[in-house]
Amino acid sequence: MSRLEIALSSTPEHLLKHLLLGTVLLTSLYALYRRLLPKPLPGIPFNQKSAQSIWGDVLELRDDPSGLAKWCSKQLENHGSPICQALMGPLSKPVVLVADVGNAREMLMGRSDFDRSAYIIDRFPLFGEFHLNMKTGDNWRQSRNWLKDLLAPQYLHNVAGPAIHSSVLKLIELWQHKFHVGDGRVFSMVSDLKTLALDVIVAFHFGSDFQDSALDRQIDHVGKLDGSKLPSGEYNEVEFSKAPLHEFQQGLTDVGDKMAAIYTTKWPPLLVAWWVRYVSPYYRPFFEAKDRFIRKHINLAVRRCRSDEDPSTGIDYMVHREEKAARKARREPVFDKQIMVDEAYGNLIAGQHTTSAALVWILKLLADYPSVQEKLREELQGIFDSAMQENRLPTAAEIIKSKLPYLDAVLEETLRLRAAMLVPRDAAKDTELLGHRIPKGTVVLLVCQGPDYKPSPPSKYWSDVKASRMYPGKGNPDLEIFDPERWLVRNEKGDLEFDGSSYPQLAFGLGIRSCWGRRLAMVEMRIMTTLMILKFELKDVPKGLRGHEASYDISYRAKKGFLHLKSRGEFP
């Protein structure tokens, strides 16, 4: 008889049962542990240490102060590879990270293999049935169809352009007030540019049906302030209080900020959004009121449409499009459906939040690079010579129709450096990317400012896909440097031209899921930058207020946005 048999025969039966039960329990726990461990995709680099933890990379990502976008960039750099994967914890699929190299962006954004990512959709439930939050399908096509006329030259020139120009002139007036009340001291521009974008996007949609200007309220408020009683910050920057907004505009601003917070929350986004939408005593009344407000304006547009009046507002154009589509399909229009309300509401939120972030970066970079600012001013003064002779600022039509290659290069370079950081896509079917199998449903993040922005790739693994960036001009080879020259070329006649087609930035995405509002945003940036550079000199601000630290939510948003203005005084 073996020692084991002797030991077992002398062991009480109840102890044997406990021993057996313990063995089964430990085996089950180990099996559960193995089941909960991340399952990396074969062949794609990953963190070996993270693969041995059921939490994968989640804890490291959570504790990284630089945020998701920078963390993704560091993973690619650490692996020395243009593709790697992040392990996202128990029972979650890996997320594939891809550097913006070779044909990766075209593969991700130009092929039907990849679609709008659930990663984004799940983080913006407060958008409701807005097209941004839909997979590509019939509802998405219907919603996008309503917006087609808002991209037409007639709308851009006759409706959008004048509305933007009028709002920027109000912003200039506001900043002149702040300059005088604050005795020329530095002040923050962030809130004012959000107010500009808010006024503009509301004017796009409602036109003369809504005449309560947020900028007018700020102008009246600042004009009544006593500069000697205004508080100052650490660097003697002046701090201005804000006027209350119309309740609808205040709600749009607050919900936009809350969406940005939900994007980065550590709580389940759907749970937080549910609480905001249905429970919060502050936000719940807005969601109820905004539906009534937007429906009222849709009904006004329907009455105008059926009275054969020409469309004059963004809502008018949407209603005309839906009326035509319903007639063609022999169905009832959906004017009373939530999908149309949410489309208008979503555009109001997204339009003011993302554009204002870009406007801040434009003025920050021009202040940081005075030689670029002066060169831009020289171009504008030359092109708008007749306006200069008449001692006036150029009109919206003059700005929109003029060829301004250096201005276009400044805007393109700003968007390249300070816009998209991550572009998420979902694999719509089993596919391949950079030679690796990508299963259906996998989230892929295109990392737009990864290690490929550095002059020297960190590893031989880049060699097969690391082609030189096809920027047309002769800009600085360091892609982290702001240099508009990389977008400028000379034509056969020797004239300077802007060429943004060779390697387009991803601020508005690519392919059919690109941002529909790109043209509107570019017109707004063009008009704002032109008028500001002609009216003001953007001077340097104290070092402690200069930083380019940013947060990444709906957009890439500067944490510091300060202005030190000098009025040029040429214009009334």
UniProtKB/Swiss-Prot annotation:
Keywords: Heme, Iron, Metal-binding, Monooxygenase, Oxidoreductase. Pfam families: p450. The keyword Iron applies. Its EC number is 1.-.-.-. This is Cytochrome P450 monooxygenase xilC. Heme binds at C515. InterPro entries: Cyt_P450, Cyt_P450_E_grp-IV, Cyt_P450_sf, Cytochrome_P450_monoxygenase. Cytochrome P450 monooxygenase; part of the gene cluster that mediates the biosynthesis of the 6-methyl-2-pyrone derivative xylariolide D. XilC hydroxylates the 5-alkyl-6-methyl-2-pyrone backbone called prexylariolide D, produced by the highly reducing polyketide synthase xilA, on its side chain to form xylariolide D. GO terms for molecular function: heme binding; iron ion binding; monooxygenase activity; oxidoreductase activity, acting on paired donors, with incorporation or reduction of molecular oxygen. Gene3D superfamilies: Cytochrome P450 (1.10.630.10). The gene is xilC. Its cofactor is heme. Pathway: Secondary metabolite biosynthesis. Belongs to the cytochrome P450 family. One of its GO terms (biological process) is mycotoxin biosynthetic process.
